[in-house]
């Protein structure tokens, strides 16, 4: 049986991420959202902390840019239908995008679900989606990688 905190976590994922991402063609699988574009894919991963427990859940948002040609060079086998964030060419956390240290969202018995849902939706709309918009083609990815290496 799930604890109140686990139920809150499920609600926060369902109401915080899905309503914003589904209309933008993101598909959900487990704690991952993936959107495939013509040349690249965008991934949002919800990573639970291994230090939490059933009554205190901590998680953060990881972001990835998946590029099929890069994946083919470094992996064998069929291209994944739902790639995961660790195999992405470019990987970031919400911390990187917000310019903060180690941000983990926390859920416990006293968490205000609606407040946390609002914060997550703002982070998606203000930081994650603009980041994805900057990296929606192979050309833009190559320019970003070149810029980061300088």
What are these regions (language model features)?
Residues 7-28:
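Amphipathic alpha-helical segments
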Residues 1-9, 28, 35-150:
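Intrinsically disordered, low-complexity regulatory regions enriched in serine/threonine/proline
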């Amino acid at each position: 049986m799930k604890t109140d905190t686990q139920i809150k976590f499920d609600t926060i994922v369902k109401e915080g991420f899905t309503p914003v991402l589904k209309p933008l063609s993101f598909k959900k699988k487990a704690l991952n959202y993936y959107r495939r574009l013509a040349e690249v894919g965008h991934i949002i991963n919800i990573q639970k902390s291994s230090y939490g427990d059933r009554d205190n859940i901590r998680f953060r948002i990881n972001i990835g840019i998946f590029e099929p040609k890069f994946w083919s060079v470094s992996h064998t086998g069929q291209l994944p239908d739902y790639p995961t964030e660790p195999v992405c060419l470019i990987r970031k956390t919400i911390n990187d995008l917000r310019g903060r240290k180690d941000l983990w969202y926390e859920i416990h018995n006293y968490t205000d679900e609606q407040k946390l849902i609002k914060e997550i939706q703002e982070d998606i709309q203000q930081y994650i989606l603009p980041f994805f918009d900057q990296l929606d083609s192979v050309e833009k990815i190559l320019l970003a990688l070149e810029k980061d290496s300088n």
